[in-house]
């Protein structure tokens, strides 16, 4: 059955040469038994073809349409992740890395919320979240974070590790996202600490409901985190936020997360980073400008 699954995937694969010998493999409809099929772009560093014996760490990134190409990104401004990684690797500042850009769907809001935190929400908060999801085009009506992670770990990562020369252990497997994508990246590392050794969460949308006067959803997530904290001895986390736009409301929430992480044994500027970027807003342009910081934390030599 697995052979049929992988063979089917290869039928959808399109190899596109990117700048300076990087290669992007696009799978237009990556199938899943847990969530709707979606596009996945897999960027191989130029070192991949240069040394056939070398294996590479892998970074799984959310909102994949905004990760690599300006043409597919919101407001035509991507994170420019591939070129940033290539430049840093060429300067010997980071290890070369495979980037897996996972496109979102209309179920984004439900897929990216840390599902186990929902048990600490009120019925009214859950109802409001379902209404928000509807405005985004989702008709599912249930939280989908656990199923999304099953897809990520049990299907996508299996395919990537089978198809490419990856370093498969947790130490070399990281996950990254912004806003709600930051929440699911944290959740992935907490739910699957044996799979993801590092998580980078930019402009993490702790308030969830876009209401800075209601702190309960943020508290619900922290309750979950406190009960499921990965061991600090072999995990690393990066958090940040700006001070403009939507990011202006994140500071108090992030400070409480910082306190929780430090109480749990994480060491600031060692295996834990928390940063504030003055004036940065809640958009791809801002995340693009500081993505090098993320890569240096995850893969710096």
Model-derived features: positions:
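Positively charged n-region of N-terminal signal peptides that target proteins for export
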Residues: 1-4
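Bacterial N-terminal signal peptides
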Residues: 7-15
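Sec/Tat signal peptide C-region and signal peptidase I cleavage site
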Residues: 15-21
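Non-catalytic cap/lid and distal C-terminal segments of serine-dependent acyl enzymes
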Residues: 22-301
């Amino acid at each position: 059955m697995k052979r049929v699954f992988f063979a089917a995937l290869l039928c959808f694969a399109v190899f596109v040469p990117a700048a300076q010998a990087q290669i992007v493999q696009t799978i237009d409809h990556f199938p899943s038994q847990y969530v709707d099929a979606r596009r996945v772009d897999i960027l191989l560093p130029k070192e991949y073809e240069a040394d056939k014996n070398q294996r590479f760490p892998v970074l799984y990134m959310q909102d994949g349409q905004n990760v690599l190409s300006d043409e597919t990104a919101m407001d035509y401004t991507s994170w420019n992740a591939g070129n940033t990684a290539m430049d840093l690797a060429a300067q010997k500042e980071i290890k070369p890395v495979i980037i897996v850009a996972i496109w979102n769907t209309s179920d984004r809001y439900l897929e990216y919320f840390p599902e186990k935190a929902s048990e600490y929400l009120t019925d009214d908060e859950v109802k409001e979240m379902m209404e928000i999801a509807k405005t985004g085009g989702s008709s599912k009506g249930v939280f989908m974070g656990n199923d999304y992670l099953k897809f990520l770990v049990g299907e996508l990562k299996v395919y990537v590790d089978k198809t490419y020369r990856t370093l498969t252990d947790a130490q070399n497997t990281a996950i990254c996202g912004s806003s709600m994508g930051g929440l699911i990246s944290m959740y992935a590392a907490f739910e699957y600490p044996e799979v993801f050794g590092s998580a980078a969460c930019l402009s993490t949308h702790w308030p969830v409901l876009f209401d800075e006067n209601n702190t309960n959803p943020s508290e619900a997530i922290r309750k979950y985190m406190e009960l499921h904290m990965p061991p600090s001895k072999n995990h690393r986390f990066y958090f940040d936020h700006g001070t403009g736009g939507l990011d202006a409301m994140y500071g108090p929430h992030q400070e409480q997360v910082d306190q929780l992480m430090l109480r749990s044994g994480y060491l600031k500027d060692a295996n834990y980073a928390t940063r504030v970027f003055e004036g940065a807003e809640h958009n791809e342009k801002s995340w693009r400008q500081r993505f090098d910081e993320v890569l240096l934390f995850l893969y710096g030599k």
